[in-house]
UniProtKB/Swiss-Prot annotation:
Name this protein carries in UniProt: Nuclear export protein
Disulfide bonds: none
Gene (UniProt): NS
Function as written in the Swiss-Prot or TrEMBL entry: Mediates the nuclear export of encapsidated genomic RNAs (ribonucleoproteins, RNPs). Acts as an adapter between viral RNPs complexes and the nuclear export machinery of the cell. Possesses no intrinsic RNA-binding activity, but includes a C-terminal M1-binding domain. This domain is believed to allow recognition of RNPs bound to the protein M1.
Protein keywords: Host nucleus, Host-virus interaction, Transport, Virion
Parts forming coiled coils: none
UniProt motif Nuclear export signal: location: 12-21, 85-94
InterPro entries: Flu_NS2
């Protein structure tokens, strides 16, 4: 993963963890947890593309891999909707900027995962 994406993930996760939103903190913690999970998945998928041995292993487990990939895209869509909702209800400009950046990062990561998955298919 490129260093800008790594620092973007870390920056957004740090800022989200410091937020105190009117909605329950459990909602935000869920978003943070999903965001971290997505980051790890994206990292592992990128590493898999780099190692041909894993490529052949993934081909052998193709059905399971495709199901997992589908679940990750569902998680991304859920995160995008949650962040859009949070963006609509927040009035704090710091939070708005954080959510806008999180949304941009999610869209970038979704595109990267799509690119990696096409390379693996």
């Amino acid at each position: 993963m490129d260093s800008n994406t790594v620092s973007s993930f870390q920056d957004i996760l740090t800022r989200m963890s410091k937020m105190q939103l009117r909605s329950s903190s459990e909602d935000l913690n869920g978003i943070i947890t999903q965001f971290e999970s997505l980051r790890f998945y994206r990292d592992s998928l990128g590493e898999t593309v780099m190692r041909m041995g894993d490529f052949y292993s993934l081909q052998n487990k193709n059905k399971k891999w495709r199901e997992q990939l589908g679940q990750k895209f569902e998680e991304i869509r859920w995160l995008i909707e949650e962040i859009r909702h949070k963006l609509k209800i927040t009035e704090n400009s710091f939070e708005q900027i954080t959510f806008i950046q999180a949304l941009q990062l999610l869209l970038e990561v979704e595109q990267e995962i799509r690119t990696f998955s096409f390379q693996l298919i």
